[in-house]
């Protein structure tokens, strides 16, 4: 049985129910464990769901983790990833997004788009005849949120009652992480500068999800308040792509928001640290970033395994998100 409507897209974590998120995380873990165990035993794992199929990677922004994770995930499923950078195709320049979506989706089994604006990936999805996955835009980053949840589940075994403290900018990564946390029962406390605002429409989505799933969220202006009793502290870049000209201003704006050892001491003694990378020293000290409670490289690797699960669900299973085979 396939999903009621094909193609099914993933543009934000809001597109997934709590149950679907949990299934994707469990399936990601199952795939990861199978590959790790077979690698240790020098046996190969053969997944052929995308055999002889192509996945287009439409990237208007440079990337390390998203590109490598998507290409390796497609390979895991036996498919071929076609990287289409901003200099390779005429995305919204000499050809409309409508035309681009129609043409490319007619030749591939799926599209992963890393673009500047949410409206761009939404337009691609609206007119595509194959699934479109948001690899990052200015508003959402669902693949990162799934990798974060897998990392949290591996570490704490359960989501229930955990507290995540976010320290820093109100950006695309925060948006989907807040929504994801609210859906799976994780409490979120966000510390941001007074003159940085979380969008009202995002807060509305988070509030609805929190009410439905028994989680809470709060927004404060003091990192010391946010991290109190936190199980995980998360931060991200203060200067996203396209904001380079604002660097000096933004560094002043985020004074006092570096995650340091002193900040971590205010959280639970077992508190972990996460960062989606790339990292800059003004955001987090070396002591924390490279410390024994840092999960940053495990988190980065998990981008691959959650992407495999998403591709399998949307492309191979035609939108149906199934429980892990071992369930």
Swiss-Prot record:
Active site at 276
Q: Can you quote a single GO CC term? A: mitochondrial matrix
Q: What domain of life does the native source organism fall in?
A: Eukaryota
Please indicate if the UniProt record lists Zinc-finger as a keyword. Answer: no
Listed GO biological process terms:
arginine biosynthetic process via ornithine; citrulline biosynthetic process; L-arginine biosynthetic process; urea cycle
EC class (word): transferase
Pfam families under this entry? Answer: OTCace, OTCace_N
Q: Give the catalytic activity.
A: carbamoyl phosphate + L-ornithine = L-citrulline + phosphate + H(+)
Reported EC number(s) for this entry are: 2.1.3.3
List the Gene Ontology MF annotations in alphabetical order.
amino acid binding; ornithine carbamoyltransferase activity
UniProtKB keywords = Amino-acid biosynthesis, Arginine biosynthesis, Mitochondrion, Transferase, Transit peptide
The residues that hold carbamoyl phosphate are: 63-66, 114, 141, 144, 276-277, 303
**Which Gene3D superfamilies does the record match to this protein?**
Aspartate/ornithine carbamoyltransferase (3.40.50.1370)
Query: Which pathway, metabolic or otherwise, does it act in?
Result: Amino-acid biosynthesis; L-arginine biosynthesis; L-arginine from L-ornithine and carbamoyl phosphate: step 1/3
For the ligand (L-ornithine), the binding residues are 172, 236, 240-241
Checking InterPro entries in the record gives: Asp/Orn_carbamoyltranf_P-bd, Asp/Orn_carbamoylTrfase, Asp/Orn_carbamoylTrfase_sf, Asp_carbamoyltransf_Asp/Orn-bd, Orn/put_carbamltrans
Subcellular localization, as worded in the UniProt entry: Mitochondrion matrix
Q: What assembly does the database describe for this protein?
A: Interacts with trx2.
Q: Which NCBIfam families match?
A: orni_carb_tr, PRK00779.1
Similarity section: Belongs to the aspartate/ornithine carbamoyltransferase superfamily. OTCase family.
Please give the function described in this protein's UniProt entry.
Ornithine carbamoyltransferase involved in the synthesis of arginine from glutamate via ornithine and the urea cycle.
Identify this protein by name. Ornithine carbamoyltransferase, mitochondrial
Instruction: List the source organism.
Output: Schizosaccharomyces pombe (strain 972 / ATCC 24843) (Fission yeast)
Task: Kindly list the organism's lineage.
Answer: Eukaryota, Fungi, Dikarya, Ascomycota, Taphrinomycotina
* Gene that encodes it: arg3
């Amino acid at each position: 049985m396939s999903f009621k409507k094909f193609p099914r897209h993933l543009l934000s974590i809001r597109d997934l129910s709590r149950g679907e998120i949990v299934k994707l995380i469990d399936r990601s873990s199952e795939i990861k464990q199978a590959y790790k165990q077979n690698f240790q035993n020098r046996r190969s794992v053969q997944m052929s769901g995308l055999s002889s199929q192509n996945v287009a990677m439409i990237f208007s922004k440079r990337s390390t983790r998203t590109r490598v994770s998507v290409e390796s995930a497609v390979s895991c499923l036996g498919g071929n990833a076609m990287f289409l950078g901003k200099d390779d195709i005429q995305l919204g320049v000499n050809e409309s997004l409508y035309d681009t979506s129609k043409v490319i989706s007619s030749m591939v089994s799926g599209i992963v788009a890393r673009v500047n604006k949410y409206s761009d990936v939404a337009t691609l999805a609206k007119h595509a005849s194959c699934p479109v996955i948001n690899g990052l835009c200015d508003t959402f980053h669902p693949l990162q949120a799934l990798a974060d949840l897998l990392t949290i589940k591996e570490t704490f075994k359960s989501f229930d009652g955990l507290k995540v403290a976010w320290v820093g900018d109100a950006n695309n990564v925060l948006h989907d992480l807040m929504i994801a946390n609210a859906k799976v029962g994780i409490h979120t406390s966000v510390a941001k500068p007074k003159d940085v605002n979380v969008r009202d429409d995002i807060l509305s989505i988070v509030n609805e999800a929190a009410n439905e799933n028994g989680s809470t969220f709060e927004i404060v202006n003091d990192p010391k308040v946010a991290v109190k009793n936190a199980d995980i502290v998360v931060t991200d870049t203060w200067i996203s792509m396209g904001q380079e000209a604002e660097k000096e201003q933004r560094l002043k704006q985020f004074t006092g928001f570096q995650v340091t050892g002193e900040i971590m001491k205010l959280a639970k003694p077992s508190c972990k640290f996460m960062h989606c990378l790339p990292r800059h020293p003004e955001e987090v000290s070396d002591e924390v970033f490279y410390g024994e409670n840092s999960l940053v490289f495990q988190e980065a690797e998990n981008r691959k395994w959650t992407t495999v699960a998403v591709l399998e669900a949307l492309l191979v299973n035609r939108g149906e998100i199934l429980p892990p085979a071992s369930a």
